[in-house]
């Protein structure tokens, strides 16, 4: 696969993952903060605050998980390099 095509696929996957995260966040926060039967067309103060906190927490956790996964991936790469170096040519 040529580098340009690989870059395009990576960009498409990133967009798909971001859309999925947005949809899951929206659904989870809506379920948590907005009652199934609306009383008014506008969000109440409590609903608005709940949604703000929910989205903030969701994004914070997503960022923390991303950093941790990157860290673990880098550790795995280092371990693989060490294993390859130690089992080098015989």
UniProtKB/Swiss-Prot annotation:
Membrane-topology descriptor: Peripheral membrane protein
Domain notes from UniProt: The twin CX3C motif contains 4 conserved Cys residues that form 2 disulfide bonds in the mitochondrial intermembrane space. However, during the transit of TIMM10 from cytoplasm into mitochondrion, the Cys residues probably coordinate zinc, thereby preventing folding and allowing its transfer across mitochondrial outer membrane.
Any single biological process term in GO: sensory perception of sound
Protein name (database record): Mitochondrial import inner membrane translocase subunit Tim10
Main localization of the protein described in the UniProt heading: mitochondrion
UniProt keyword NAD, yes or no: no
Compartmental location: Mitochondrion inner membrane
Signal peptide range in chain numbering: none
GO molecular function terms noted in the UniProt entry: membrane insertase activity; protein homodimerization activity; protein-folding chaperone binding; zinc ion binding
Self-association state and partner proteins as the record states: Heterohexamer; composed of 3 copies of TIMM9 and 3 copies of TIMM10/TIM10A, named soluble 70 kDa complex. The complex forms a 6-bladed alpha-propeller structure and associates with the TIMM22 component of the TIM22 complex. Interacts with multi-pass transmembrane proteins in transit. Also forms a complex composed of TIMM9, TIMM10/TIM10A and FXC1/TIM10B.
SUPFAM superfamilies from the UniProt entry: Tim10-like
Membership in a protein family: Belongs to the small Tim family.
UniProt entry keywords in alphabetical sequence: Chaperone, Disulfide bond, Membrane, Metal-binding, Mitochondrion, Mitochondrion inner membrane, Protein transport, Translocation, Transport, Zinc
Record function comment: Mitochondrial intermembrane chaperone that participates in the import and insertion of multi-pass transmembrane proteins into the mitochondrial inner membrane. May also be required for the transfer of beta-barrel precursors from the TOM complex to the sorting and assembly machinery (SAM complex) of the outer membrane. Acts as a chaperone-like protein that protects the hydrophobic precursors from aggregation and guide them through the mitochondrial intermembrane space.
Disulfide linkage: 29-54, 33-50
Motif (Twin CX3C motif): 29-54
Lineage: Eukaryota, Metazoa, Chordata, Craniata, Vertebrata
Pfam families (alphabetical): zf-Tim10_DDP
Tissue specificity note: Ubiquitous, with highest expression in heart, kidney, liver and skeletal muscle.
Gene Ontology cellular component annotations, sorted alphabetically: mitochondrial inner membrane; mitochondrial intermembrane space; mitochondrial intermembrane space protein transporter complex; mitochondrion; TIM22 mitochondrial import inner membrane insertion complex; TIM23 mitochondrial import inner membrane translocase complex
